[in-house]
Curated annotation (Swiss-Prot):
Coiled coil: none annotated. Interacts with UvrB in an incision complex. The UvrABC repair system catalyzes the recognition and processing of DNA lesions. UvrC both incises the 5' and 3' sides of the lesion. The N-terminal half is responsible for the 3' incision and the C-terminal half is responsible for the 5' incision. Keywords: Cytoplasm, DNA damage, DNA excision, DNA repair, Excision nuclease, SOS response. CDD domains: GIY-YIG_UvrC_Cho. PROSITE patterns: GIY_YIG, UVR, UVRC. It comes from the Bacteria. Residues 15-92 form the GIY-YIG domain. This is UvrABC system protein C. Belongs to the UvrC family. It comes from Pediococcus pentosaceus (strain ATCC 25745 / CCUG 21536 / LMG 10740 / 183-1w). PANTHER family: UVRABC SYSTEM PROTEIN C (PTHR30562:SF1), UVRC/OXIDOREDUCTASE (PTHR30562).
């Protein structure tokens, strides 16, 4: 239900076009939308029932603002500006820097071809986009051999290497007539638009003549050029009977997710397909319109001659903003292309859902399998503990956290044991459990739903003893037991330490296995780090003149014996260490190294 403050603002909304900004309790803009009628659109958020992401959006709205515009077109433009400025959480946002390469013919006296990643209004001719840099480079290399322009830096008084190779018209040493450039550029444009039959026939004739003249290297080069045409141009499926450059957008919506497909059609061929997936909160037509305008604004790309979209969008306004026709075909080839894009969008979204289901079975589903097997309420967080030591010395413990079946590494913790000086699993468990949960209680932090101990009944009962008898906590605790091959086997749980078997092929079993492996890895890694540090410190302590302060300076600055050994005297003395002590360090470590 809307607050009294919002109800008052709703009553004042005008019947005019504009943009609205939804805000949360912190006055952050969480959604920007446009409306032909602000009063109707904004009121619909609070006067209708919603599901999914829209319901979540509405639940977070604490206030809203709006800006009236003079037309729908202005509202479109303002919406894009506001989205890019505030990056609201619930809006579809496109990442910058995701453009594709283009081939450019420069607008110069002696034009040249190059690959660029953005389009500028500089009078140049741009063709693309290409699916990747490799495809653009392959095309450029072909054009430079077959339709050369200028490859050198310009006039230098003598022919360049490329001129001798037939890949430059000679601006390096002579005046090249504009007509000659114009002819070449016309041929390049024709080729890029898909007219390849003439050049293929010409190349085949040249290859035949080169072979007859026994110029086999040249013939092989021409053969490669013909091969490029065959595999790169001719084998692309022709999907349109006209060569108009066009982009095509369509979508599929299901379960609050929007799947968008973009087809790039050039040279009567589908040269590139993009797909995007977004959870959406509002009207799909508004979201798609916003996406299309951001798409062209962010990519700073060459606009096609035509954009095809599904019905329901305001084509007229988008066409005015973009400066190219935006059309919805009703029949024929273009309509079929739109249907193809929609079919692809549906396939992409269904694949997304299947992956989400699989991920859920491995995470939250696996967590539920474990809690069901133990007969405890469903939960979200598991904390697992393991100990590590070397022959009873340098005792440490480690804790890993899994939330909804996924490792939460920022919650991992390491413990140097303070009250245990020998290998004692029960004492080690008591100390680490006591330290962990006393702290959580003092800081009033949330407790886990399940604790797993890597070990058997010794660790399990020690943990339960501290939790119940010292801290009055009743967190479920289970032990992770391994078989004789040191592989995850069962859980032990309950007052009688009963064995709880999980199906070895179940996701719950795999999750226990991952947790056990992860806590063991984390404990071993911590122990090795500590051992290496202690070993290094002890070796430095044996050097005459090196006390705790000097040792800590060396450790902090160099980090390892090898780095200290490789340092020169000056570097050691710069730490404030006397020359005599520095020399002793160098000599001692040198002897030790040998």
């Amino acid at each position: 239900m809307a607050s009294e403050h919002i109800e008052h603002k709703l009553a004042l909304l005008p019947d005019k076009p504009g943009c609205y900004q939804m805000k949360n309790l912190n006055s952050q803009i969480i959604y920007v939308g446009k409306a032909k009628n602000l009063k109707n659109r904004v009121r619909s958020y609070f006067k209708s029932s919603h599901e999914g992401k829209t319901a979540k959006l509405v639940s977070e709205i604490a206030d809203f603002d709006y800006i009236v515009t003079s037309s729908d077109k202005e509202a479109f433009l303002l919406e894009i500006t506001l989205i890019q400025k505030f990056q609201p959480y619930y809006n579809i946002k496109l990442k910058k820097g995701t453009g594709y390469p283009y081939i450019k013919i420069t607008n110069e006296k002696d034009p040249r071809m190059e690959i660029v990643s953005s389009v500028r209004r500089d009078g140049g001719f741009y063709f693309g986009p290409y699916p990747n840099v490799y495809a653009a480079e392959e095309t450029l290399h072909f054009l430079e051999k077959v339709y050369p322009l200028r490859r050198c830096n310009g006039f230098q008084g003598r022919p360049c290497l490329y001129y001798h190779m037939g890949q430059c018209l000679g601006a390096c040493f002579q005046e090249v007539p504009k007509e000659e450039y114009d002819q070449q550029i016309a041929k390049i444009k024709s080729f890029l638009r898909g007219n390849v039959a003439k050049i293929k026939q010409s190349l085949q004739t040249k290859m035949q003549k080169a072979s007859e003249a026994m110029e086999f290297e040249r013939a092989a080069d021409i053969r490669d050029q013909i091969h490029y045409i065959e595999v790169t141009v001719e084998k692309q499926k022709i999907i349109s009977n006209d060569s108009t450059p066009r982009d095509l957008f369509n979508f599929y919506l299901d379960k609050g997710w929007l799947s968008i497909q973009i087809f790039f059609i050039r040279q009567s061929r589908l040269i590139k397909r993009e797909k995007r997936l977004f959870p959406i909160a509002t009207d799909v037509n508004d979201e798609l319109s916003s996406f299309i305008l951001q798409f062209y604004n962010n990519k700073n790309k060459v606009l096609p001659n035509e954009i095809l979209v599904p019905s329901g969008l305001d084509n007229k306004i988008m066409a005015e903003i973009l400066g190219v026709p935006v059309r919805t075909p009703q029949r024929g080839e273009k309509k079929n292309l739109l249907e193809l894009a929609k079919e692809n969008a549906q396939i992409t979204l269904e694949e997304k859902f299947r992956l989400m289901e699989l991920d859920e079975s491995k995470t939250t589903g696996a967590m539920k399998e474990i809690t069901d097997a133990l007969g405890i309420p469903e939960g979200h967080r598991i904390e697992a503990f393991d100990h590590s030591h070397i022959q009873g010395s340098e005792l440490v413990s480690a804790m890993v956290v899994f939330t909804d079946g996924k490792p939460d590494k920022k919650m991992y913790r390491k413990f140097k044991l303070n009250t245990v000086d020998h290998a004692d699993e029960a004492a080690s468990t008591r100390e680490v459990i006591r330290r962990r949960y006393v702290r959580l209680l003092k800081e009033k932090q949330s407790l886990p739903d399940l604790i797993l101990m890597d070990g058997g009944d010794i660790q399990l009962n020690a943990a339960k003893d501290v939790l119940v008898n010292e801290l009055s906590l009743h967190i479920p605790v289970a032990g992770m037991v391994k078989n004789d091959k040191h592989k995850t086997s069962d859980l032990i749980f309950g007052s009688q330490d009963q064995r709880v078997q999980l199906d070895p092929k179940s996701q719950g079993f795999y999750l226990v296995q991952r947790i056990q492996d992860e806590v063991h890895r984390f404990a071993i890694t911590f122990h090795r780090q500590l051992h290496a540090k202690n070993s290094l410190a002890s070796q430095l302590d044996l050097i005459q003149g090196v006390g705790p302060k000097t040792r800590n300076k060396l450790l902090k600055s160099f980090g390892s014996l090898n780095k200290i050994r490789d340092a020169n005297l000056k570097e050691i003395e710069e730490l404030g260490i006397p020359e005599k002590v520095a020399k002793t360090i160098k000599v001692s470590l040198s002897v030790h190294g040998k």
